[in-house]
């Protein structure tokens, strides 16, 4: 990782306001579980729609990343070639073959943004695709074909929230 571009961005634009942007990096213990459950990704189209600094994305090759914070995308581009700076909720795929086989996500939680993000992810998920999502606990009843894989307490610093790793299918 070459920090030159990231430092230049911070000097010009300042740091990201983490709280208002709902930026809570995915802890390594959860990332390890995501990687284990996803398994082999050969030949699969993979997306992380709220990629942040790449805690999840860095575990996968040829992953597509989206983040709305420019600083995060500057950092992501150091390791990944398919990076978009923009709001995931406005991201669309042009044709059926552009849909994703696997979507790994830790979306923002504030004001039920997690629900909107998962609903949008389902729209761009391939017919036999799978979503692995880190969400607040107790959300499995919101979606069909949703399974709790793991439960985590106090994994995200200064939040006190219980989260789960969910597996969703279309």
Language-model segments: residues:
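Class I S-adenosyl-L-methionine-dependent methyltransferase catalytic core
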Residues: 1-170
């Amino acid at each position: 990782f070459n920090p030159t571009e990231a430092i230049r961005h911070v000097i010009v634009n300042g740091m990201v306001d983490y709280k208002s942007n709902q930026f809570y990096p995915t802890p390594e213990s959860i990332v390890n579980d995501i990687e284990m459950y996803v398994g082999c990704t050969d030949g699969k189209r993979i997306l992380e729609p709220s990629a942040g600094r790449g805690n999840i994305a860095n575990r996968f090759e040829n992953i597509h990343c989206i983040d709305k914070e420019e600083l995060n995308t500057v950092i992501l581009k150091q390791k990944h070639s398919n990076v978009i700076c923009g709001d995931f909720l406005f991201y669309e795929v042009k044709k059926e073959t552009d849909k994703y086989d696997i979507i790994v996500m830790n979306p923002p939680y504030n004001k039920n943004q997690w629900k909107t993000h998962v609903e949008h992810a389902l729209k761009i998920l391939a017919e036999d695709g799978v979503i692995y999502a880190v969400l607040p606990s107790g959300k499995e009843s919101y979606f069909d074909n949703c399974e709790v894989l793991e439960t985590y307490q106090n994994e995200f610093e200064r939040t006190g929230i219980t989260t789960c790793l969910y597996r969703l299918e279309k």
